[in-house]
């Protein structure tokens, strides 16, 4: 039999085990190291975030993996550089750890003095970008798309460029600079259709007999391309007169029009990876790790490419 002292020892042993269990389960002994949650603000150049769907998915994945809290901020007035720079100041004052900015005007924004890391989504070439920036070379993208147009369309088909000079971003400007250079070198006829002149242009295309002389339409950005595709899809006469509709962008509306054959071809970049890399570079900057500019590739795709596994994964990333 166990004596009185033995029973006491057993009780004390059990009590010690319970206490040790409680201490471990409440982190009183084994404490998990606390990781800092980085506050990162992403300020884009637009008034809405529709065009940043895949970008945001990549951004959210990086935030989850790298212990960051990311907030996407839009402008009240599209392409308002003063508002964007004021927002940068506001976020810094509010304690944001780092900024990711899609600049309205690259030169002004890049020259702005900040005390926190700023990752820029540059629209120019890599040589013009600093460490940590993510670059999509829109001039090269425009050149690439123009070469595809020249390859696919007969030499006597005129190219009409839909553009909005008053609301043109650096991305739009560089994209058209690239396409213009290729068309000019090839001696291809290019005419501008300015914002506000589209209705008259489409009315002309609807006139009887115009379908005999096909035209090619090139849109400078996603919004203009979506609008043009809506017109082509809604008018049989315009559709008959348009030999090809081209542009850039990866919104669901654009991809649906491409799948339907309304849009002939688009240039795209991996926007999911752009979002991911931008957050990654912001965290690297905060942790003092070295980084170099990340240069993104551009790709030309048409309807058949939507079923290509590589492009499908890029255009329709799983959240």
What is each residue range found by the language model?
Residues 105-140, 251-259:
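Flexible loop/hinge segments that line or gate small-molecule binding clefts
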Residues 119, 222-223, 233-264, 300-306:
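Venus flytrap/periplasmic-binding-protein-like
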Residues 40-57, 62, 71-81:
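Extracytoplasmic "Venus flytrap"
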Residues 8-25:
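Hydrophobic membrane-insertion alpha-helices, especially the h-region
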Residues 92-103, 119-121, 158-163, 190-191, ...:
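Periplasmic-binding protein-like
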Residues 133-158, 250-254, 269-287:
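Hydrophobic alpha-helical segments within soluble ligand-binding/sensing domains
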Residues 9, 273-319:
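Hinge/cleft segment of the Venus flytrap/periplasmic-binding protein
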């Amino acid at each position: 039999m166990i004596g009185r002292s033995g029973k006491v020892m057993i009780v004390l042993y059990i009590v010690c085990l319970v206490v040790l269990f409680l201490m471990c389960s409440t982190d009183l002994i084994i404490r998990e190291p606390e990781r800092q949650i980085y506050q990162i603000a992403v300020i884009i150049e637009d008034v809405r975030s529709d065009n940043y769907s895949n970008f945001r998915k990549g951004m959210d994945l990086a935030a989850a993996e790298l212990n960051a809290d990311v907030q996407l901020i839009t402008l009240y007035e599209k392409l308002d550089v003063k508002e964007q720079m004021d927002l940068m100041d506001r976020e810094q004052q509010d304690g944001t750890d780092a900024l990711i900015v899609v600049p309205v005007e690259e030169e002004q924004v890049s020259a702005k003095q900040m005390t926190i890391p700023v990752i820029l989504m540059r629209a120019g070439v890599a040589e013009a970008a600093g460490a940590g920036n993510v670059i999509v070379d829109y001039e090269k993208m425009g050149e690439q798309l123009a070469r595809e147009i020249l390859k696919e369309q007969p030499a006597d088909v005129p190219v009409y460029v839909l553009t909005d000079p008053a609301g043109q971003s650096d991305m739009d400007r560089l994209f058209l600079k690239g396409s213009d250079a290729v068309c000019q070198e090839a001696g291809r006829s290019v005419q501008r259709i300015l914002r506000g002149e589209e209705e008259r242009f489409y009315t002309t295309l609807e006139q009887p007999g115009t379908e005999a002389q096909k035209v090619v339409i090139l849109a400078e950005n996603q919004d203009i391309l979506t609008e043009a595709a809506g017109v082509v899809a809604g008018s049989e006469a315009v559709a008959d007169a348009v030999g090809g509709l081209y542009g850039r962008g990866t919104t669901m509306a654009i991809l649906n029009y491409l799948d339907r054959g309304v849009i002939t071809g688009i240039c795209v970049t991996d926007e999911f990876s752009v979002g991911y890399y931008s957050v990654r570079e912001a965290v690297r900057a905060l942790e003092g790790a070295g980084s170099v500019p990340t240069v993104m590739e551009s790709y030309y795709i048409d309807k058949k490419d939507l079923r290509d596994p590589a492009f499908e994964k890029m255009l329709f990333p799983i959240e």
